[in-house]
Amino acid sequence: MASQSTANPNVLSLATIGSVARLLTLTGATLTTGLISGFFYAYACSVSLGFALLPDEQYVEAMQAINATVRNGVFTFSFFGAVLFLVLALVIYAPRMRSLRFLLIALAAVLYIGGGFMATFLINVPMNQELALVSSDAAPATPAQIRAEYEGPWNFWNGVRTVFSSLSFLALIGACLSRSDSG
C-alpha cells in the first residue's frame, strides 16, 4: 500500500514562512532606511540651503517650527522603523551569518544605528531641545549669536547622519541584490 502524505497543501510550511519573514524584514529595513536617508539628504541639499538665506531671527524661528513638527507618525515610522527592521533582519538572517546578504545587513545596521541614529539622538536632538528653549523675548543671546553656535554644528552633524544613513541604504540595496543567502 502506498504511503499517503498527511501534509495539508493549504498550510504554509515553516520554510515558506521563514522566506516570507526574511523578505519582509529586508524590504522593511531597506524602505525605512531609504526614507530616512532621503529625509536627511533633503534637509542637507534644500532645507538648510534655504534657511541659510534667512535673517537670523527668522532662521531661529524656522528651525524651532520644524523641530516642533518633525516628530510625527511618518517620521517616527522611518526613523525608528529602520532600527527595528534592521535588528529583526539581523535576527532572522542570523542562521545565515556567513552569507554575503547577512554581512551586508550587519554592515547596514552598524552604519545606520552607529552613524545616523546615534548622531541624531546624541547631537542633533539635544541641539534642537536647546534651541526650543530660546525665546525671542527673553533670550540672553541675540539671534545672531544663537545661530552662530547652532547652524554650523547642526548642519555638520546632519551631513554625518546623511552619509551614514545613505551608506546603510546602499548596503541594504546590495543585500537585496545579493544572490548569496547561504554561507
Predicted regions and their residues:
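A hydrophobic membrane-anchoring alpha-helix module
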Residues: 162-182
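Hydrophobic residues within alpha-helical transmembrane segments
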Residues: 31, 80-84, 160-163
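Interfacial segments of alpha-helical transmembrane regions
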Residues: 17-33, 91-115
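Interfacial loop at the N-terminal end of multi-pass membrane proteins
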Residues: 4, 9-13, 35-80, 126-152
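Hydrophobic residues within the alpha-helical transmembrane core of Major Facilitator Superfamily
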Residues: 34, 87, 114, 170-173
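Hydrophobic alpha-helical transmembrane segments
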Residues: 76-90
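Hydrophobic alpha-helical transmembrane segments of integral membrane proteins
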Residues: 107-129
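Structural signal for membrane-spanning alpha-helices in multi-pass inner-membrane proteins
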Residues: 40, 86-93, 120, 172-176
